[in-house]
């Protein structure tokens, strides 16, 4: 396992934050988020480009390091540990939309088991992988080589997986087994060669999906029999939606737009405004995760190629 201590980096970050604004808190472009700071600077040369993250109970962050095919854990004191590395596809494999093998969404089950999506460009590797607390990662559901599994969420014993290439949402039993297409509504698709369905969450009996190419946030009800209901566009004009998370206030969400270098606060009525920009340290934000009023943003620097990082902030209720 790879261990990296970030203590010195975190100390330097704290100093920078203390100089940025009175009281040691950086100023965001909008008062919905305050105390914006860099939780950790990551190493681009080492492949540390986080695509998704989830927050553990102790405040540690589980990160998927996209093209490095790694899953890593960042502790509150700045230690970065590699939990697993997924197997590489054969040399020369062309992954749809991306070109290279790519670890995407991550979710943690109540028993601590982690699940991730993996787009590998082969029938033998693409799908949903389980990372047990002890032992090697194992694929629990196969998806076709043409799929690009991306966002991931758990709801009532089922894993829901967005597919950016096929414009679909797959459903997989938590215990593993056959993946089935749960929804393939036209609203989930992107233009040919573009990312469609991307970030995915479940809330209030519905699967919510961001469409990267269309800049929309979608809501798909889960029927009493588990089938997908009619897709509704809850917000549009958002730019390239990569990932999002709910704030805990109604259906308000924070949305990361990747090349756009912005985080948007989207209200339940579909209105939205920018709350973070590159001026706050964003470097192509790929994911947002909240625990209470703590907000974490993963920055992969896919396009800026500079300073991938994790930003932290505090959510101001009702802003």
Predicted segments, located by residue:
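Secretory targeting and sorting signals
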Residues: 1-29
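Beta-propeller fold detector
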Residues: 35-42, 80-88, 138-142, 179-186, ...
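Beta-propeller domains
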Residues: 63-85
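Short loop/turn segments that connect beta-strands within beta-propeller blades
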Residues: 74-79, 131-136, 173-177, 221-226, ...
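Asp-box/WD-like beta-propeller blade repeats and closely related beta-sheet repeat scaffolds
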Residues: 123-156
């Amino acid at each position: 396992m790879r261990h990296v201590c970030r203590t010195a980096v975190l100390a330097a970050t704290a100093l920078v934050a203390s100089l940025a604004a009175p009281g040691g808190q950086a100023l965001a472009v909008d008062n919905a988020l305050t105390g914006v700071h860099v939780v950790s600077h990551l190493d681009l040369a080492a492949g540390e480009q986080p695509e998704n993250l989830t927050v553990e109970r102790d405040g540690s962050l589980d990160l998927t390091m996209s093209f490095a095919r790694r899953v890593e854990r960042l502790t509150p004191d700045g230690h970065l540990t590699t939990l697993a590395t997924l197997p590489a596809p054969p040399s020369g494999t062309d992954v749809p939309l991306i070109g290279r093998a790519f670890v995407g969404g991550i979710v943690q089950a109540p028993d601590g088991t982690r699940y991730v999506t993996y787009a590998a460009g082969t029938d033998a590797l693409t799908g949903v992988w389980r990372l047990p607390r002890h032992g090697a990662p194992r694929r629990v559901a196969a998806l076709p080589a043409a799929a690009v599994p991306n966002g991931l969420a758990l709801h009532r014993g089922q894993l829901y997986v967005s597919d950016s290439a096929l414009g679909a949402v797959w459903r997989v039993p938590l215990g593993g087994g056959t993946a089935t297409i749960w929804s393939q509504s036209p609203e989930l698709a992107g233009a040919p060669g573009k990312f469609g369905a991307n970030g995915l969450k479940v809330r209030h009996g519905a699967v919510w999906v961001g469409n990267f190419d269309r800049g929309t946030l979608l809501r798909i009800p889960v029927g009493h029999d588990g089938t997908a209901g009619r897709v509704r566009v809850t917000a549009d004009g958002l730019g390239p939606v990569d990932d999002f998370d709910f704030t805990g206030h109604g259906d308000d969400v924070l949305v990361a737009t990747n090349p756009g270098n912005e985080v948007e606060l989207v209200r339940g009525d579909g209105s939205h405004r920018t709350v973070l920009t590159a001026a706050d340290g964003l470097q192509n934000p790929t994911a947002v995760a909240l625990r209470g009023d703590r907000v974490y943003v993963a920055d992969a620097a896919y396009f800026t190629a500079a300073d991938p990082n994790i930003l932290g902030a505090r959510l101001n209720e009702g802003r």
